[in-house]
Amino acid sequence: MEHQVFEVLQGCLSEEPNTRMRAELALKQLEQNVEFSPAIANIALASEAGPAVRQAAIVQLRGYIGRHWSIGSAKYEQGPIPDQQLKCQVREKAFTLLTSDNRKLRTAAAATIASMARYDWPDEWPQLFSQLVELLHSGDRDQAHAAMCVFGEWVNSDLSGQHMEQIGTLLPQLKRIFVSSGDYSIETRTMAVRVFGDCIEIIANMSSVQNDFVATHAPPILEEWISPILATFGQPVSTEGSASDIPLKIECIKAI
């Protein structure tokens, strides 16, 4: 199965339109095999497959999750849904890619994991949140960036006032990354502020039903953040390529 998927992925990358079209149709057929997801996850992990094929594999896996991971998906298509044993294998492989030294693979894996989280957390993948927080806390700057990419999609779309325990755990890590300019990239720090803004929006949306809770907890959180945010505004603007801090300043404005 894995060899078949590999060859079809190569065809999907062909510059020849007819070859590419045939390969894309063949890939759709292979998705009907319950072993497809672990096979394509293995290819994404295989360094010998080459960067282009590995990138294609993890992108295709994300699409597969939308179509075949859960009958509750808005994009669900008829076909076998992997059992929990297969899903567990695929989750582990995708999570491993968050520690890849290839930035594109890490980012694509983060998007894939965020898609899985929509259906699997907390019931089927209860440890995911703590695993991601651990990457933020103990991982290197690239791993922290990958974990932040997951939170960037996940918090905004799938967390709510029912997840205050998780938000309370996440907020200190977001602030630590935001203020650690020497340890993390501008991009990662910008995402930390963006996710902080998403968390604050979730808390604010609770005011209609838990006004006392919001009134008690929101001010101390904002007080902790306001000083470093104002300090960011006081720094000279940098506009040099990826080191530009303009996106960071924009997110700070949105957050307050």
Language-model features, listed with the residues they occupy:
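N-terminal "cap/leader" segments of large eukaryotic alpha-helical scaffolds
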Residues: 1-51
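Structural recognition of alpha-solenoid helical scaffolds
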Residues: 1-4, 22, 35-40, 60, ...
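Helix-loop junctions that connect tandem helical modules in alpha-solenoid scaffolds
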Residues: 8-15, 40-49, 93-102, 132-141, ...
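Hydrophobic residues within the alpha-helices of tandem HEAT/HEAT-like
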Residues: 12, 27-31, 60-68, 112-118, ...
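Extended alpha-solenoid scaffolds built from HEAT/ARM-like alpha-helical repeats
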Residues: 17, 21, 37-38, 122-126, ...
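HEAT/armadillo-like alpha-solenoid scaffolds in large eukaryotic assembly and transport factors
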Residues: 26, 70-87, 158-171, 181-185, ...
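Eukaryotic helix-linker segments that join adjacent hydrophobic helices
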Residues: 49-113
